[in-house]
Structures are given as C-alpha cells and as structure tokens.
Amino acid sequence: DFPNIVLIMTDNQPAEAVGCYGNNEIYTPNLDALAADGVRFNNAYCPNAMCSPSRASVWSGRMPCQHGVHTWLNDKLMDQWPEDWNAIAEFDTLPEILNRNGYATAMIGKYHLGKLDKPQNGIDHWITMSRGHTLDFYGNEMIVNGDTFIHDGHSVDFFSEKAVDYIDGRTNSPDQPFLLMLPYNGPYGHWPAILGPAKNQFWDRYADMPMTSIPREGLNERAIDAFQLAMEWLHQGKEGPNFYSLLQLPNNLTSLRNYYSQVSVIDHGVGQVMNALKENGFDDNTIVIYTADHGFSLGHHGFWGHGQATWPSNAYRIAYNIPLLMWGAGISGKQSSSSFVSSTDIYATLLDRLGLWEDLEKQNIPSRNFTGLLIGDDDNWTDEVFIEQEETRAIRTPAWSYFKRFGGSETYPLKNELYDLINDPDERADLSGQKEHQDKERELSDKIDIFFNTYANPKFDLWN
C-alpha cells in the first residue's frame, strides 16, 4: 500500500534549535518523542539558506542552478507576476507526481513559491497566507480554498488546527492515500515578528531564560560589509535588504527568547498532528518528516539570519544544518544517523518508497535516495553535500568545509575559505591559500566544479 505522507517544514530553524539535537533550554517534547521513535539525521543540510530556493529544491529535488530560484520571492513584486504564476511550474514536483498516482494532496501553511490565491503544483486542498514573509504571527490574512479572511490568532496554531481537520476528514476516504505538506511560517526569526516579548502561550517559560545555548559574539565584519552594501544600493536608488535589524538582533535576549517560544508553538502543533494521526488510525501507514527550509544564525559567527546575511554569502554550518526527523511506515526507529544528506534528497527517497523513482532517476536530478539510511544501512552512501548561495558554492564532508567564491567580479574580489572540521568544528580558522593545504583545496574545488557542471542548467546558472 502507498503510505500517507506528512511533510512538516519550518521557516528559519537550525538543527540545534530542537531539544533532541542537544539543546537543553528549548522546550520541544513532541519533536523529541518523534526523534526517539524515528530517525534523527545529525548532518542534514539545505542546498541554499534562503526560503524560496530551498523550498523549490525540496519540492522538485533540484538545485537552485537547475530550477532558477536563487533568492526569496519579494511580496512587494507580487502584483507584477503573471496570473497563476509559480516559480517551479515547469518541473515535476513531489505533490504533482503523487497526485497523478492517486494521492489526495494538501498544502497548509507558507508557500512562498508563487501566486497564492489558487492551488499550485498539483495540490487539491489549499490553505496559505496571502504573503510569503511574516511580519506578525497574529492578524494574518488567510486563504482557505479560495476564501480570504483575517485570522486573529497565531498563524502556526491556525495551520495546526487546519492540518488536524484535514487528517480527521481523511477518514471519509480511508482507501485513498494522502500527502499533507505542512510548511509552518515560524519560528521565522526576523523583526517585527519576534520584536519584544512574545504573546504566545509559551512565553512565560522563556521570559527569564539565560539563553546560554546561544553564543555571545561581537558583530562579524562581513555582516557589516553586507550592511554597507545595502546602503550603497539605497544611495543608488535601488531597494536593498533592510539590514538595520540584522545588526541589532545578535545578543538581543528578548528576541532570542521570543524565537525559542515560537519553536515551542510549532512543537505543540506537531503534537496535535501526531495525535490526530493516531486517533484516526493512520499511524501504522504514515510517514512523518520534520525539517526546515534552512538553518539560521542566532548570533553564531557574529551574524543574524541566513547565508546572505554576510557579504560575501557564507556557508557556515549554522545557516545550513537543518533538523531532519523521519518516523513511520518502513522506517527503523530509535536510531540516529550521522550520514550527510541534503533536503533535496527527500524527493528521491519518498518517490523510491512509492516505487516511482526509477524513471525519474534517469533524469539529471541530484536528489539522492537515502532509503538505506532509514533502515541503518550506510555502506554505499557518500558523505558529502553541496551548497550554493549566489556568489558562493560550497561542499561539506565530515572532515572539511570549503567555500568557493565566484571569480568573475572585478568590483568585489572574493576570497575562498577552507575549514578543517576535525580540528576546527566551529569554522574559525580559514586555511585557504596555505601551501600545506593546497592539494585539499584543489580537490574540493574540483568536486564543486564537477557537481555544478553536471547539474546546472545554463538558463539558471549564475556563474556562467
């Protein structure tokens, strides 16, 4: 039988912002229970540390240089988009493939890949917000299968309630498998959404938390460089990102506590979803996946936010290492895996579980099938992941992290970076350009070139 699939994705959450990844301050009992009974991946990475590109990669199994989404989609430009436009319309997405094969498909949460008023990408049941970014968790305009209204309460609670309603309703069609995409719009991590004390039910737990799980660091000079670049754009009459808050947020204890409380709101919702699956008898034939669109620095390395929060873009672990928990049908539980996987690999792995990957595998798709890892077999797995963030491409292995920078700009000469993760796991001592490491640097650089030469689509390859 085809299993039901629940794919939960959060917005801006590093792996270490979950209790089961070793954080003893954050309250995530439901996620910890999911990890205890399922598989926890310790080295899961996103291909790009921005919302829209990473989501496009999970939905399509492709890298940004293949699907063409390289940064977040700007809500302010939405009126200029063609009717019914979405950024990955030409690709066979996970919900479209499952829909063709008899699945009921639902998307409840943040989309951020195109127009929002109508269902996209093979989705039958469509519930989302009327914007991609979260300015406030309360009072958001919601779209429920074409009906638009303001929801006064917390948006994460709203999406959780609608997910439970959807699961309850599936008992009317028990023989039809379903795919539920549940991309929450939290914890988010930007002002004004996390400015000041939180209004949610978990704030009291964190109001006086010392937040020792977050390092206290001075501002990274590259975060300041990014701010200065944004100011140059503004002086030229261009609209650049608002980096003022990104320089104010590091070490802001109130916002850090607010952020943690939003993670707990999500955890509460995950508990509701798991209870709904069990109460309706779906738990024996359902796969549940919990992950994030990308990681997020909460002041680590002296910057706040994504890979693009510095100039040039960085590829530090904190911005790319994501939680990945899998539980359910066909998965050997109570284990953790240290194998290196990418969120693009979810695509191939789920399709293989359904017997639908063989034909797609012949296409030029970098998504890797990690089914073996779900039953504890890692004998034939290659421990490396590839990352791209516009002017930065990177490879991570258990021993090394290498950032390769675009070399075609005379205005901004960019430096490569090499880190020895065995002796320098926090990526502090850049070894690039040193004679004793030149062979390793050349080896990793060649691997990056081979990977992107293999998979990049010339239409969408920013480096060529």
Residue ranges and their predicted role:
Residues 2-16, 33-34, 58, 98, ...:
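Beta-strand elements within well-structured catalytic alpha/beta cores of enzymes
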Residues 59, 132-149, 246, 271-275, ...:
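Substrate-binding rim/cap in mid-to-C-terminal beta-strand-loop elements of soluble/periplasmic
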